[in-house]
Regions:
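Residues forming the flavin
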Residues: 1-206
Length: 206
């Protein structure tokens, strides 16, 4: 069983930042376990700009922002495993994981950092009624389909909710040639930033 000082579960921005910080602080062996096929996490599908202003003092897209962390991690020779799913963490900090190359394996860690990121609520948790789910997507799923998979989920779009991701997807779908019929909001005000309301809705007459 291989041993590491720190095992970080999740290779998104939080996991990468934790690994870089640990390595710069003098920790000898750091390992990142990422279930996706590349590092970067949710940032890989966020191709709009607005990232990096505080950390790098410049405006970057999500993939550019992730790339800065990935470059630093590689410069520091931080180990990582992709397409790897963590199955269990024991009280003794033994991490059980699996991937196609190694099968099921165990890693002994002195410390474990959980940096798995967040997930959207499911269709059921969102209380979307009906029994025909075809054509109904969460904003994050639609974003991944368009920006990463290259799949257009629809040509006539109604967006429920005016949070930032909904506003950004209204603009993105418009860029791809879809007709965004309406962005519907239950509250009397938008949940998104004023900047996104102007740049994503007003500028495109949505």
């Amino acid at each position: 069983m291989r041993a590491y000082d720190i095992v970080i579960i999740g290779g998104g921005p939080a996991g990468l930042a934790a690994a870089i910080s640990a390595k710069k602080s003098g920790v000898d062996s750091v390992l990142i376990l990422e279930r996706d096929k590349e590092l970067g996490g949710i940032l890989n599908q966020c191709i709009h700009n607005g990232f990096g202003l505080h950390t790098f003092k410049e405006e970057l897209t999500g993939p550019e922002y992730a790339g800065r962390f990935i470059d630093q991690a590689k410069e520091l020779n931080i180990e990582y495993k992709l397409n790897t799913m963590v199955m269990d963490i024991s009280p003794q900090k033994v991490v059980t994981a699996m991937n196609r190359e190694e099968g099921l394996f165990e890693i002994q860690a002195k410390a474990v950092v959980l940096a798995m990121g967040c997930r959207e609520r499911s269709r059921g948790a969102l209380n979307i009624p009906g029994y025909r789910p075809a054509g109904i997507f969460s904003a994050g799923t639609a974003q991944r389909l368009v920006n990463i998979e290259g799949y257009m989920p629809g040509r006539e779009v109604v967006i429920l909710g005016s949070g930032d991701i909904g506003l950004i997807m209204a603009r993105r779908m418009t860029f791809e040639g879809a007709k965004v019929k309406v962005v519907a909001e239950l509250m009397p005000y938008s949940g998104g930033l004023k900047r996104n309301i102007v740049q994503c809705l007003d500028d495109y007459d949505i």
